[in-house]
Amino acid sequence: MEDYLQDCRAALQESRPLHVVLGNEACDLDSMVSALALAFYLTKTSEAEDIFIPVLNIKRSELPLRGDNVFFLQEVKIAESALIFRDEIDLLALHQAGQLTLILVDHHMLPKSDAALEEAVAEVLDHRPIEQKYCPPCHVSVELVGSCATLVAERILQGAPETLDRQTAALLHGTIILDCVNMDAKIGKATLKDNEYVEKLEALFPDLPKRKDIFDSLQKAKFDVSGLTTEQMLRKDQKTIYRQGTKVAVSAVYMDLEAFLQRSGLLSDLSAFCQDHSYDALVAMAIFFNTHNEPVRQLAIFCPHEALRMTICGVLEQSTSPALKLTPIPSISAHLQAYLQGNTQVSRKKLLPVLQEALSAYLDSMRTPAGQLEAALGMSREQADKELDKASNSLIAGLSQDDEDPPLPPTPMNSLVDECPLDQGLPKLSAEAVFEKCSQISLSQSTRACPSNK
């Protein structure tokens, strides 16, 4: 693959049309490997001898934040210098010059900042439900499996298995195992197809690492935050939610929260992080494993604005859908509230609707006479929880369990920043809304009938 990647870089210097395989903005291991393996395969099988260029959808400077990516590249002997990052290729200029064909892998929807590139998208390969209300006007292959690398492996082995070398097989094999939590049936992340293609890769290359060995190594590398600054730790796996001008960062922190709170200069680091990125609040979701290898989840809410902080904390403490079962942890600052999260099944994805409710409650309080906020929350809390539960269920109806985070630390998922159904708040439970949701579910299910290019 090294020679191929050198050819890709050389192609960037030529004035010629380019085929780009673009991973998602999280650039997790699945996204990186899927882009590399699919582009390599398409280049090898191109009848016109076109070159397909894999592009990692982050800046080169951000790669060190993804420890499992860095570790695996070293493990399979691919030099970081050979890779092409988003800040090293001007996709917009290529598109405006009519020289860009884009293939999306491990995502199916471009962020608003890339809206101008939509016309260049020729194919989509993803493993999560279609969020748009229409089938993109291109070849679309979407299947709900644990890892997009599974779909890439399927594409290769069904199309031209003779092109698969051990290096690419090792990349796909390790990625599927990490994404599917070592194929553990109790976790429920791996589908039959994930298991099928892991077994096929192992049959073709019997010297691939043992599953437990590669899973343990990748997971250790993924959650290794030693040497990272506070800002790097917060940016390593971060989502952002907005609500009428209020902006909240939601970051996964892969260590014991109590140890995190003892970091030197932490409060000034948190303040600088929020100020530099214009966040009104920061929610840190800590997760680590105890001595019994059981997941432990903790929460910290940092917010200098007392009203916003109290509203977020109040909604989280009172939430029953889901019930977080929070126990306060002694705080190091009046601007920070920390908790032990008793319900470890509540992942970030499941917490986001609750945080959206908190932002709505805060914004409502800005329009509510002083002293009435608590009464408003308390008076309708039970009803509000029921309505939130119904609304959340209506939002995820039609999605498979595969799209939910596992009860272990998840790999970074596609960004929820842009075009998320929750960005505009929870829907009103009217007859029209129910009808609209049913229509969306039907469209989502019908995407299986869209043409795919295998």
UniProtKB/Swiss-Prot annotation:
Classification via Pfam families:
DHH, DHHA2
SMART domains annotated for this entry? DHHA2
The record lists Mn(2+) 1 as bound by 28, 106
Per UniProt, activity regulation is: Activated by magnesium ions and inhibited by manganese ions. Inhibited by dipyridamole, moderately sensitive to IBMX and inhibited by vinpocetine.
**Cofactor field:** Mn(2+)
Region Disordered, as annotated, extends over: 398-421
Q: Give the top-rank taxon of the lineage listed in the UniProt record for this protein.
A: Eukaryota
Q: What is this protein's function?
A: Phosphodiesterase (PDE) that has higher activity toward cAMP than cGMP, as substrate. Plays a role in cell proliferation, migration and differentiation, and acts as a negative regulator of NME1. Plays a role in the regulation of neurogenesis. Involved in the regulation of microtubule polymerization.
| Subunit field text | Homooligomer. Able to homodimerize via its C-terminal domain. Interacts with NME1. Interacts with GSK3; at focal adhesion complexes where paxillin and vinculin are colocalized. Interacts with alpha and beta tubulin.
Q: Which family does it belong to?
A: Belongs to the PPase class C family. Prune subfamily.
* The protein, known as: Exopolyphosphatase PRUNE1
- Which organism is this protein's natural source? Rattus norvegicus
Task: Tell me the name of the encoding gene.
Answer: Prune1
